[in-house]
């Protein structure tokens, strides 16, 4: 599939993820673009963050083969795409919890190595817990209201992060959002 001005965020994620995987490189989509995918674009991200421990030289080769140009550091832009691709350094984690397994989302454009909905919720809640960022809470709610998540895992992780009170706010917000979607 060719990258052009009509390529969606999900298609771009699949194209990049598939190219990396086929080159033997491991990188997992995280952050706001995962929320965009799992919220059916209720939240609109402007970049794709692939967390990786791979060497930049190896990433450069794959990204160049797709038509991307390195902007600075670990950022890439494609002349036909509105989205930037960034490669934050590993480790892949939510709060203090490392992530060792993730989702493989099959699409028409390829397979995306991506956080699970539960991991995405935890990723967004980590921002809410650390910085009291309401936008991160809203994004966690968007994902949890549309996809099954392991609420007991999120609860125990929240407790380990000393954030049981904010977790309860999240649970109430999800209940409210689900009732408004029905």
Question: Which residues does each PLM region occupy?
Answer:
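Compositionally biased terminal segments of proteins
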Residues: 1-182
């Amino acid at each position: 599939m060719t990258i052009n001005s009509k390529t969606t965020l999900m298609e771009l994620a699949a194209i990049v993820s598939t190219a990396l995987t086929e080159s033997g490189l491991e990188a997992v989509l995280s952050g706001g673009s995962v929320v965009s995918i799992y919220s059916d674009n209720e939240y609109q991200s402007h970049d794709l963050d692939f967390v990786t421990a791979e060497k930049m030289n190896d990433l450069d080769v794959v990204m160049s083969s797709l038509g991307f140009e390195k902007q600075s550091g670990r950022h890439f832009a494609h002349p036909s795409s509105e989205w930037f691709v960034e490669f934050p350094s590993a480790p892949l984690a939510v709060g203090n919890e490392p992530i060792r397994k993730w989702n493989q989302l099959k699409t028409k454009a390829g397979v995306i190595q991506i956080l699970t909905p539960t991991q995405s919720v935890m990723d967004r809640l980590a921002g809410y817990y650390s910085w009291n960022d309401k936008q991160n809470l809203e994004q966690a709610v968007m994902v949890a209201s549309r996809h099954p998540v392991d609420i007991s895992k999120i609860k125990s992780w929240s407790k380990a992060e000393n954030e049981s009170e904010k977790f309860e706010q999240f649970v109430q917000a999800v209940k409210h959002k689900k009732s408004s979607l029905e």
